[in-house]
């Protein structure tokens, strides 16, 4: 990821790639998943180049962001620090998984700063504990065992099976550059020095109806079954939400199928044709 700014926050310097374009629209702010980093958005950043302002960042513990001291921190406060440092009063948030959770929490805390939300298989603060099917539970147990034994390469491979391929799909369903990039991004996260305790935002699950619009929801039909179901529950609760269930992809459509994902962003009016 090309770094344009290092944004200092308590205990860290956040790596930011901001590419401004004077088109009068709120910048796109792309928030990565918890098994990736800002490079998840390579395709979207390329599509926005020269057409719309766009920003991506590596959160603490990911990518090129520098950890100076393990410090309790809040993701919402870190994002706010980035937007304030770059004098961005209002933005269009696009968040995947944990990045979707951050987008939701930020929008509820700072609704006046948000022009719209695009949530890609989002985690949600305060959501009910999921019930995992046997296949997902077996993978989760194997990941826990690999972590306990310090077998980080095995853990990385298993997490690719869970999040990139889809738990019900064969290992290696996604290969080539997408697989290599997943393993590189998640490998950094698995080996990152401790960033300090994460201070959770207030529960968002009971307040989804209060999200500022417009809200768009995207998910891959090959994702973990309980996450697909959660997306459908979210869709039923948010007034006026627009939905894009994507066939043939799992949890990370921007990585697995960037052209198809960018087509969704164009249909949503976030990218120009």
Describe each model-derived feature in a short phrase:
Residues 1-13:
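N-terminal cap/lid segment of alpha/beta-hydrolase-fold proteins
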Residues 12-67:
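Conserved HGGG/HGGXW glycine-rich cap/lid loop of the alpha/beta-hydrolase fold
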Residues 43-46, 55-98, 263-266:
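Active-site loop/oxyanion-hole signature of alpha/beta-hydrolase fold enzymes
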Residues 102-106:
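Hydrolases whose catalytic domains are alpha/beta-hydrolase-1, hotdog thioesterase
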Residues 108-109, 115-147:
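Flexible "cap/lid" loop of the alpha/beta hydrolase fold
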Residues 149-202, 207:
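Conserved alpha/beta-hydrolase catalytic His-Asp/Glu region
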Residues 183-236, 245:
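Conserved serine/cysteine hydrolase catalytic core
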Residues 246-258, 262:
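Catalytic histidine-centered segment of alpha/beta-hydrolase-like enzymes
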